[in-house]
C-alpha cells in the first residue's frame, strides 16, 4: 500500500535528521523552506523539517488513533498533504508558516523504510499461511485486503530482520557477540523470558552490555527512560542513528545464522478470527448466509474487523480437489434441501434458502426456483447462460453451484445473506464511513474486471444486485440479463427491449440495444452514485424517457453530499457519452483501489473513530 505522502514532491521517505538538514542547506536555507520525511519512532507518522532564522526545526507528526495526523498540540488533519496545506496558510505554533517546499531533485525517489522493503513479501506470506490460498484467490485477497493485513503484520516485521534472534539466552548472546571481531556497535536483539520484553545486546570496548526493552501500557517499546517506538524495528533503526541512552550507537549486525530460514517461513501474527459464535450444526441454516468459523475466546473489546477470506464463500466450494471430482452443472435433487424461507421473488419466480450437500461438507445456498409456465425459449436461454456462469469463479461474484431439474428448474447459487447494497446503506450515513463504502465498491470493481476479462457482460449491474456477505464483503449477483461475448466481439445486440432497468443503462443500450463491458462501466457509475448517496434512488422522480433526454443534454446526476470529489470524478468518467471513451474495468479497478488504499491508510480506529477522521477531512 503506497505511503499517503508518496505523491508529494517534498516527501523524502525514510531519511535521517542529518540528511534532511543537508537537503535544506542545499536548497538555500530560506525562511519557511520545508520538507517531509518518515518518522522513525511512530508507525505511519512523519517529521516536518522547517527552516527559520537560518536554524532547523523538526516537528513530529503523529498518526492519531482515529486515522488523522497532528503535530503535538496542533489541529488534526485527514492526511499529510492537508496538514502541510494548513500550515502553509497559518503557522499555528510553528516559528513561521510553510512557504517553500524543498522538492526532491529530479530522479530522486522517496527513500523506502525498513518495513517498506519487506511489506509485499510479508503480506503475501501472511495471506498464504493464514487462509491457505494460492493462485488467483491469493492475488485477489492481497489486492483487496492489503491495508488490513499490513496493519496486522507491521508489529512483527522485526522477526524478518537479521539482527533478531528468536531463541537465544543471555550467555549464548554473549558467545555470539564475542566470536569473531568485537567491533564497537556490534549488536543483536532477543526475547527475554518475561512476556513482552526483549534484550538489546551490544558490544563496546570488548565488553557486552545488555539493555532491557519493555512495553508501556500503550504498547510502545522503549529502553528505560528512552524514546518510545511503535515497533521494535523502528527502535533499532533509530538507535543506529544515535545512541540515545546506549553506551554506543548500533552499528554492526550480529546476524542470526537461521535468518534465511526465518525469511522463508516467518512467524506471522495469528489471525484474529472475527467469529465468536458457537460452531454451526450442519443440519441448520444460518440467517446471515455463511458458515461461521469455530468459536474462540474473545473479550468485548477484541473485535477485529472481518475479512472476506474468513467466510466460507471466499473460495469456490470446489476449491477442495476432493469436491472438484463431483463438480457438474446438473445437481442431484436428493443432495438439495429447499427450505420454506423465501428470500425474494420476481418475474422469473422466487428465491429460497437451502442447503446443498457435497462430498465432505454442506453449504448454505440461495435457490432460484423458476415459476411454472416459463416459456421453453426462456428456459433454453437460461440454460445456455448457466453453462457459462458455471465456469466463472471469483471471490467477488455470486457463484453458480449448479442447476437442478426436478419439480421446477432451480438455479443453485452461493448464499450472500447480508442483503442488497442499497438497503444496507439506506439510513446508515452516520454508521457506515465513506471508507467502508469505497471498500465495497472496490470489490465490485474487482468482480467486474474479472467478468470483463472473461468477455462477460452483466447488463444489470446496480446496487440492488450487489449482495453483502457482511459489511466488509460484497458480491455481484443476478446474472439474469448477462450475456457472454465471443472472443472477437466487443459488444452484442439484444433481440428485444423487454423490461430494462433504463436508469442504469448507457445511451447506446437504450438507443441501439448494444451492450458491452463499457456499458457495464456506465452502470457501475450509477451503482457508485447509489452507494455514495447511501441507498438513494438515481434520477429521482424522473421516468425512463426523461432520463434519456437528461443525458442527451449533457447533464449528469450531481455529486452526492457524502461523495469524495475523487470518486465523483470517476463516476463522471463512467458516464462519458461515447462508449469507446469510457475507462475499462482494468482502469476503474485501479482507480478505486488507489482511493480505497488512501482512505484505509488514514482510518486506523474503530468505525466511530473513523467517522471522526472523515469529519476532519470534510
Swiss-Prot record:
UniProt entry keywords in alphabetical sequence: Adaptive immunity, ATP-binding, Cell membrane, Cytoplasm, Immunity, Isopeptide bond, Kinase, Membrane, Nucleotide-binding, Phosphoprotein, Repeat, SH2 domain, Transferase, Tyrosine-protein kinase, Ubl conjugation
Modified residues (Phosphotyrosine): 248, 290, 314, 318, 491-492
Record domain Protein kinase: where: 337-597
Membrane topology annotation: Peripheral membrane protein
Compositionally biased region (Polar residues): 273-289
Binding site for ATP: 343-351, 368
Domain SH2 positions: 10-102, 163-254
Keyword Kinase among record annotations: yes
Interdomain B as annotated region, ranges: 255-336
Chain segments carrying region Interdomain A: 103-162
SUPFAM superfamilies in the record: Protein kinase-like (PK-like), SH2 domain
Signal peptide per UniProt: none
Annotated crosslink Glycyl lysine isopeptide (Lys-Gly) (interchain with G-Cter in ubiquitin) location: 543
Catalytic activity, as annotated: L-tyrosyl-[protein] + ATP = O-phospho-L-tyrosyl-[protein] + ADP + H(+)
Reported tissue expression: Isoform 1 and isoform 2 are expressed in thymus, spleen and lymph nodes.
Tree of life domain: Eukaryota
Modification after translation, per record: Phosphorylated on tyrosine residues upon T-cell antigen receptor (TCR) stimulation. Phosphorylation of Tyr-314 and Tyr-314 are essential for ZAP70 positive function on T-lymphocyte activation whereas Tyr-290 has a negative regulatory role. Within the C-terminal kinase domain, Tyr-491 and Tyr-492 are phosphorylated after TCR induction, Tyr-491 playing a negative regulatory role and Tyr-492 a positive. Tyr-492 is dephosphorylated by PTN22.
One annotated GO molecular function: protein tyrosine kinase activity
CDD domains: PTKc_Zap-70, SH2_N-SH2_Zap70_Syk_like
Pfam families, sorted: PK_Tyr_Ser-Thr, SH2
Alphabetized PANTHER family for the sequence: TYROSINE-PROTEIN KINASE (PTHR24418)
Family recorded in the similarity comment: Belongs to the protein kinase superfamily. Tyr protein kinase family. SYK/ZAP-70 subfamily.
Subunit record text: Interacts with CD247/CD3Z; this interaction docks ZAP70 at the stimulated TCR. Interacts with NFAM1. Interacts with adapter protein SLA; this interaction negatively regulates T-cell receptor signaling. Interacts with VAV1. Interacts with CBL; this interaction promotes ubiquitination, internalization and subsequent degradation of CD247/CD3Z. Identified in a complex with CBL and UBE2L3. Interacts with SHB. Interacts with adapter protein SLA2; this interaction negatively regulates T-cell receptor signaling. Interacts with CBLB.
Domain notes: Composed of 2 N-terminal SH2 domains and a C-terminal kinase domain. The tandem SH2 domains bind to the doubly phosphorylated tyrosine-based activation motif (ITAM) of CD247/CD3Z and the non-canonical phosphorylated tyrosine-based activation motif (TAM) of RHOH. The interdomain B located between the second SH2 and the kinase domain has been implicated in binding to other signaling molecules including CBL or VAV1. Thus, ZAP70 can also function as a scaffold by recruiting additional factors to the stimulated TCR complex.
Protein name: Tyrosine-protein kinase ZAP-70
Origin species: Mus musculus (Mouse)
